[in-house]
């Protein structure tokens, strides 16, 4: 059941979200140690200006799932708050389906869904179903259409019995599924997800990921996902935007990133021989461990088989272990490249 239709005049191939050179600054009180400094600041407080986001620009097409990643304090949450209309940019502009999140707020909020993994819009002492009914009234939804949408979401997320229990009695995974359902009752065109699988078990994570993929594929819901779980990114997004120190550092395809950084292979060579003075192009790093040698090679320069054949000719190799790069390793190397 597709519960969302593209608005008249909406072209999926065109930019649906356009962020143009946005900056967000905060005035933060200076804090110096010592009693004298504390007394001075009591009478005359000094401030410094902190740039949380600096000249950020990007465009997102309708129906895309984009991973918006970066270390803590990089500016991810600040960007999401500006996109969702919670914060006003200090400078720059945001247009989402030709709407300004601040100036067109009343119309805009009816077209977005927001899920913060560590915050809840569900009332804890009542069943989630009661909050759903409250949201129906807040968004002034037609009851017949609301019931159809609720049935669709509840079945898809497997929460038929869960929504009848008080929220405080639910597990984290159950609550998160209810949170996601509540954010989609009004059929938003965009879903902002901030750490949607934080603290969830493997089964709950799979349910959430499968659900996001389904509504994106069938209903063309545009999804912006911020998370530290790179498995979420790999499972859902084809494109990532990396932000660091408030600036966009990388915007591109995950496959391209894997080609660039995923060519490094970690190889453990178990041997009693002493391996030294080995001159082979493609060796990035070699270090001696207690009972093996650890090599990192660039498989774009030398293949694993070629590397191993060169070693086996000269040394008596007892065992070999080859570790493939995970998405976490790839992202970590990207962070290291930008010194984050």
Regions found by a protein language model. Give the residues of each.
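Conserved catalytic motifs of ABC-family nucleotide-binding domains
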Residues: 187
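Conserved ABC ATPase "signature" region
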Residues: 34-41, 133, 137, 144-162
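Catalytic Walker B motif of ABC-type/P-loop ATPase nucleotide-binding domains
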Residues: 191-195
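Short, charged/small-residue-rich alpha-helical element at the C-terminal edge
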Residues: 266-340
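ABC transporter nucleotide-binding domain
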Residues: 209-298
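Conserved ABC ATPase signature
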Residues: 166-170
């Amino acid at each position: 059941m597709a519960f969302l239709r593209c608005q008249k005049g909406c072209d999926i191939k065109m930019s649906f979200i356009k962020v143009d050179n946005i900056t967000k600054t905060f005035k933060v009180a200076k804090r110096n140690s010592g009693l004298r400094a504390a007394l001075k600041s009591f009478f005359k407080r000094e401030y410094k200006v902190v740039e949380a986001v600096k000249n950020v620009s990007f465009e997102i097409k309708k129906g895309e799932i984009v991973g918006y990643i970066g270390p803590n304090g990089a500016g991810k949450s600040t960007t999401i708050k500006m996109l969702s209309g919670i914060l006003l940019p200090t400078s720059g502009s945001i247009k989402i389906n030709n709407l300004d999140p601040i100036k067109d707020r009343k119309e805009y909020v009816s077209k977005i869904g927001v899920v913060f993994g560590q915050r809840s819009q569900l009332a804890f002492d009542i069943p989630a179903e009661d909050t759903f009914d409250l949201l129906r009234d807040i968004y002034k939804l037609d009851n017949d259409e609301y019931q159809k949408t609720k049935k669709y979401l509840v079945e898809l997320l497997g929460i038929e019995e869960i929504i009848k229990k008080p929220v405080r009695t639910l597990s984290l995974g159950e609550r998160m599924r209810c949170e996601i359902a509540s954010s989609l009752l009004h059929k938003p065109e965009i879903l902002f997800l901030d750490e949607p699988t934080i603290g969830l078990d493997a089964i709950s994570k799979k349910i959430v990921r499968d659900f996001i993929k389904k509504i994106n594929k069938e209903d063309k819901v545009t999804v912006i996902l911020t998370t530290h779980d790179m498995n979420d990114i790999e499972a859902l997004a084809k494109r990532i935007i990396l932000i660091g120190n408030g600036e966009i550092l990388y915007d591109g395809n995950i496959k391209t990133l894997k080609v660039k950084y995923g060519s490094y292979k970690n190889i453990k060579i178990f041997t009693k021989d002493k391996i030294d003075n080995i001159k082979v192009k493609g060796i990035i790093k070699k270090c001696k461990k207690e009972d093996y040698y650890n090599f990192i090679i660039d498989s774009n320069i030398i293949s694993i088989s070629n590397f191993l054949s060169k070693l086996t000719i000269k040394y008596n190799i007892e065992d070999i272990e080859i570790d493939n790069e995970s998405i976490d390793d790839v992202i970590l190397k990207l962070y290291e490249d930008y010194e984050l």
